[in-house]
């Protein structure tokens, strides 16, 4: 799939979720969470992939290996969710939890410092992008949310000891 097609599939999950929620008569506040949790944020991974692909084609054009007609147009708005941005504190928190969980999970095994840095980057990115402007969260709220996320992520990502497999037939030496 092209980056544009991949982005469309990912972005469409919001409207698919809203339709499913309405079909099942979920309460309006839950429909709002589904509809608003990505706001108008950028599907950055696929946008970046589209820009890289465009740059590769441009290089091929410069080398005479491709036609200028082959260069795809990359329009940022095509890689943005349709919104609206979160309209309540609860929806703002869900949207932050969604991005923090998916981003930290994709990082694999990380240190506490790396995790904290990534959480801080993600929260800052959402604030700067205006994603939280309409939901009523304060900077004090964001500090509490950040601390809660980090505490939760630490408990999820902490190292665990490797337990031996359980074999009831094995004799235990005394």
Regions found by a protein language model. Give the residues of each.
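Cytosolic, membrane-proximal regulatory domains of ion/volume homeostasis and mechanosensation machinery
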Residues: 1-3
């Amino acid at each position: 799939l092209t980056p544009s097609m991949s982005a469309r599939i990912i972005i469409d999950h919001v409207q698919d979720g809203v339709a499913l929620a309405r079909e099942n008569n979920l309460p309006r506040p839950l429909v709002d969470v589904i509809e608003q949790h990505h706001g108008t944020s950028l599907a950055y991974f696929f946008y970046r992939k589209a820009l890289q692909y465009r740059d590769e084609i441009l290089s091929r054009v410069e080398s005479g290996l491709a036609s200028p007609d082959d260069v795809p147009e990359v329009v940022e708005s095509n890689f943005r969710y349709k919104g609206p941005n979160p309209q309540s504190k609860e929806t703002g928190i869900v949207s932050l939890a969604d991005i923090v969980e998916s981003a930290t999970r994709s990082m694999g095994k990380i240190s506490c410092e790396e995790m904290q840095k990534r959480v801080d980057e993600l929260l800052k990115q959402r604030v700067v992008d205006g994603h939280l402007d309409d939901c009523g969260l304060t900077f004090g709220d964001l500090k509490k949310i950040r601390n809660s996320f980090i505490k939760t992520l630490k408990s999820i990502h902490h190292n665990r000891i490797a337990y031996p497999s359980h074999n009831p037939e094995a004799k235990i030496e005394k």
